């Protein structure tokens, strides 16, 4: 009987990808990012192995929301205290923390486990066009 094979742990050989979020629809962009973080495009994909790539997102403040989501989409934050639930619209979130819009969309597309928390540490989101990871020579993804 043949034993099932497991993909090797990538170690330091993870790839780096650069995505420009300018004028990209948020959900479609988040799918591409989540698939790169999970390595779902890899032929040796295994959901229990953290073998994904690093993803750098620039121009997060200029991501596009369709329909009336700019005014109607609701983000919540809870402090842990009574009456500590705060609500923010997408327009407010874009003004205060434009990186969190993309991070929360990608988080919603990942499994809720410890591997997903590790994957989220490999997501680097920047509000403007500059990023601090030029030394890694990221490969540009065009959407």
Regions found by a protein language model. Give the residues of each.
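Ribosome large-subunit tunnel/peptidyl-transferase-proximal elements
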Residues: 1-104, 114, 132-143
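Hydrophobic, well-ordered secondary-structure segments
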Residues: 102-103, 107, 120
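C-terminal structural segments of small proteins and small subunits
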Residues: 110-132
């Amino acid at each position: 009987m043949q034993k099932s094979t497991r993909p090797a742990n990538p170690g330091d050989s993870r790839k780096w990808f650069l995505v420009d979020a300018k004028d990209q629809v948020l959900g479609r962009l988040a799918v591409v990012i989540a698939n790169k973080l999970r390595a779902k495009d890899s032929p040796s994909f295994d959901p229990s192995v953290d073998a994904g790539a690093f993803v750098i997102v620039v121009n997060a403040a200029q991501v596009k929301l369709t329909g009336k989501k700019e005014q109607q989409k609701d983000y919540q934050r809870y402090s842990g205290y009574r009456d500590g639930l705060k609500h923010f619209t997408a327009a407010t979130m874009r003004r205060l923390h434009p990186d969190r819009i993309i991070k929360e969309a990608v988080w919603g597309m990942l499994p809720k486990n410890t591997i997903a928390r590790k994957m989220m540490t490999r997501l680097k989101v920047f509000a403007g066009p500059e990023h601090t990871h030029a030394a890694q020579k990221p490969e540009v993804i065009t959407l």
